[in-house]
């Protein structure tokens, strides 16, 4: 529009009118953005859109529309956990990720003695940029809080929960990935809460097995590391520093190094473009690595900048995967659309497995651990 001065008050209106006419007179037979914009190589028109960005191409299916229980904020245990976290300025994945199961987990103790909460340590900024995760990313996050282990331990004591899940952000900027800090958090929590069952959901620490051993040597009840998705789509879904084989190696090493006495756990998301046989193979790979507990849940896009959902798996499919996982030899499997890696982590069955394995810690063979698992299964 070289014939119209940009300073002209009518410039915008004239431009829009001419652009509309160009769209109407298009003779290419194409009516999308590709007709008017030369996109860079490797970028398809699907990657660009005009208008409001939607969180998914389809509306949520009915099984993902939950009714929030009324009166949850008036339940004593729910409020006690929330108040303790606020006062000590600590973060929970339950709130950060807007988990739909927060009421069931935090208030669980009032119904079945299995209240759980998930605390995130080492700050709120991660050095990795997985495309499914909503946690903030930074190359140089703020320094660690040296008082965090004591704060977390005190908060856990005040919560009065039976089972705590402690997760972490990746800190590739630190020499040991933050393992020494996480280890101190674990030991401090257990010192102040000796009867508590503690699950640590940790990263891969670049596959440094010595660092993995450092964490496995702490008084943990469950060592968890999520494989997240099937192998084929891992490069697209996870940060390039997190690989499928590295995750399997981490989990397998914990099992072997502890002679099977440490319960290992992992999680798989559905709805990222995986095929049925790929999910089955991932379960096989986890079981071969010695993983005893697994969860499967529906991936939901946390923000506009994250990966879109490829499909919504039906509840019947999740039931199928639970049956298959148990038939493969997993001791525990939680599988459902709203299941997350820490979902009802402290429920009776998994707690019983942990107790039986702790009783078998004096044993020196895998057979003794297997016998303990059999006792737990029959409880």
From Swiss-Prot:
Entry binding sites for [4Fe-4S] cluster 2: 126, 130, 133
Cofactors named for this entry: [4Fe-4S] cluster
The protein's name in its UniProt record: Lipoyl synthase, mitochondrial
Domain of life: Eukaryota
Pathway assigned to this chain's UniProt record: Protein modification; protein lipoylation via endogenous pathway; protein N(6)-(lipoyl)lysine from octanoyl-[acyl-carrier-protein]: step 2/2
GO MF term list: 4 iron, 4 sulfur cluster binding; lipoate synthase activity; metal ion binding
Enzyme superclass (EC): transferase
GO CC entries: mitochondrion
Family per similarity comment: Belongs to the radical SAM superfamily. Lipoyl synthase family.
EC number per UniProt: 2.8.1.8
SMART domains: Elp3 (SM00729)
Organism of origin: Leishmania braziliensis
